[in-house]
């Protein structure tokens, strides 16, 4: 499972998930992607389960990129512990995901195969997601006016 090799501090505060993702919201490596539609903490176990589901379906065919990394420790108190006596110990790692963030990318396979693999991965995640292609992110070219259109518009 994914986790940082070392961190500056063992424990972090919970924080807030406001707004949309401003980074990691475009497809950079593959042809297809899975984009988050709502904010959530995604655990290292959920990322690993999604990766296994995609890899098992695609087999040797394509390549998969995991675009998120669990770098936030979540602490838990021991069972039947009285109140007070400080914060609990880190138990697992999560990735803070905002809407619009690309979670996984895939390339080297046909779109129906990628779509089904991403659907299987989406079932392992606690949020709503959407399948996107690289073409969805390309800006449409502004239409160039032809000479006949320019002549008629000046009349």
Swiss-Prot record:
**Record's keyword annotation contains Cytoplasm:** no
Question: What SUPFAM superfamilies has UniProt attached to this entry?
Answer: Ribosomal protein L16p/L10e
| GO molecular function annotation | rRNA binding; structural constituent of ribosome; tRNA binding
Q: Name one Pfam family in it.
A: Ribosomal_L16
Keyword terms of this UniProt record: Ribonucleoprotein, Ribosomal protein, RNA-binding, rRNA-binding, tRNA-binding
Instruction: Look up keyword rRNA-binding and say if it applies.
Output: yes
User: Which GO annotations describe the biological process of this protein?
Assistant: translation
What Gene3D superfamilies would the database entry show? Ribosomal protein L10e/L16
Task: Name the source's superkingdom.
Answer: Bacteria
Q: Where is this region: Disordered?
A: 1-22
What Gene Ontology terms describe where this protein resides (cellular component)?
A: cytosolic large ribosomal subunit
- CDD domains per UniProt: Ribosomal_L16_L10e (cd01433)
Q: Which InterPro entries match?
A: Ribosomal_uL16, Ribosomal_uL16_bact-type, Ribosomal_uL16_CS, Ribosomal_uL16_dom, Ribosomal_uL16_sf
How does this protein assemble? Answer: Part of the 50S ribosomal subunit.
User: What NCBIfam families does the database record attribute to this sequence?
Assistant: rplP_bact
What family does this belong to? Belongs to the universal ribosomal protein uL16 family.
**Biological function:** Binds 23S rRNA and is also seen to make contacts with the A and possibly P site tRNAs.
Record-given protein name: Large ribosomal subunit protein uL16
- Which gene name belongs to this protein? rplP
């Amino acid at each position: 499972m994914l986790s940082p090799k070392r961190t500056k501090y063992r424990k972090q505060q919970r924080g807030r998930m406001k707004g949309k993702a401003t980074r990691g919201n475009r497809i950079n490596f593959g042809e297809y992607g899975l984009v988050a539609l709502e904010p959530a903490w995604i655990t290292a176990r959920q990322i690993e389960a999604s990766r296994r589901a995609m890899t098992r379906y695609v087999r040797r065919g394509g390549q998969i990129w995991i675009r998120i990394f669990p770098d936030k420790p979540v602490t838990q108190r021991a069972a039947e512990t009285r109140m007070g006596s400080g914060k609990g110990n880190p138990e697992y790692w999560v990735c803070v995901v905002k809407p619009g963030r690309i979670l996984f990318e895939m390339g080297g396979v046909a779109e129906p195969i990628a779509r089904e693999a991403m659907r299987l991965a989406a079932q392992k995640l606690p949020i709503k997601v959407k399948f996107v292609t690289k073409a969805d992110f390309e800006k449409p070219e502004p239409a160039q006016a032809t000479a006949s259109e320019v002549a008629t518009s000046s009349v």
